[in-house]
């Protein structure tokens, strides 16, 4: 959690991508995280009128696919590397610089905290699948990556239980996740009609 997550100008990427037309972003947008969802938010924000969009990542590289990053750069998205979010404010996020030592360890550099002005800040930090349901529910199999095993309709190995999203496919684009989730919702509806 980052201090300031509940401010009115701070949003989660997944919420924005569901209905981008309902958001008034302003001209400057900051995005924390650099996965495929962050690229989706960045490109969508530019199309919806933002003039300057910057993606901030804690490492020296971006987690999104090469294709997604290239498209974002073509669209005019800016990238800031080795930044650690300290606090979110109504004037924009505050980041500290991260230095990487010779052993490859990342350390926040004290005294480098700086406000990066933005009208809107998005949190697009990827989150791995949550394993609580698998560890507390019998009959749901997972693969070697810890993802829930499902058929083409999202049915798990336990009767009557369906799954979709990152917990099934890993980190994909929001468009792919929504497409599969809609198919799973249809399969769930069909299943429930037979009960």
Residue ranges and their predicted role:
Residues 5-26, 103-110, 114-171:
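FAD-site-proximal beta/loop scaffold in flavoenzymes
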Residues 11, 78-80, 94, 162:
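General small-molecule cofactor/ligand-binding pocket signal
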Residues 24-50:
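Rossmann-like NAD(P)H-binding beta-loop-alpha module
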Residues 34, 57-60, 166:
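Cofactor-binding loop segments of dinucleotide-utilizing enzymes, especially the Rossmann-like FAD-
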Residues 41, 164-195:
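A conserved FAD-binding loop/helix module that cradles the flavin
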Residues 42-86, 195:
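Rossmann-like dinucleotide-binding cores of NAD(P)H-dependent redox enzymes
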Residues 82-92, 97-99:
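A conserved short coil-to-beta-strand element within the FAD-binding core of flavoproteins
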């Amino acid at each position: 959690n980052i201090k300031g997550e509940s401010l009115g100008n701070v949003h989660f990427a997944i919420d924005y991508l569901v209905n981008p037309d309902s958001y008034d972003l302003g001209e400057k947008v900051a995005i924390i995280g650099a996965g495929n969802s962050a690229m989706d938010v960045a490109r969508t924000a530019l199309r919806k009128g933002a003039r300057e969009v910057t993606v901030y990542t804690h490492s020296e590289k971006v987690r999104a696919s090469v294709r997604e990053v290239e498209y974002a750069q073509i669209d005019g998205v800016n990238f800031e590397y080795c930044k650690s979010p300290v606090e979110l404010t109504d004037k924009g996020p505050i980041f500290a610089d991260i230095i990487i030592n010779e052993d490859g360890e990342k350390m926040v550099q004290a005294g480098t905290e700086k406000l990066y002005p933005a009208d809107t800040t998005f949190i697009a930090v990827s989150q791995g699948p949550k394993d609580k349901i698998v560890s507390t529910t019998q009959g749901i199999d997972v693969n070697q990556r810890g993802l829930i095993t499902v058929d083409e309709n999202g049915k798990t190995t336990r009767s009557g239980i369906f799954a979709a999203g990152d917990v099934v496919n890993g980190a994909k684009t929001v468009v792919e996740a929504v497409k599969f989730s809609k198919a799973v919702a249809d399969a769930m509806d069909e299943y429930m009609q037979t009960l």
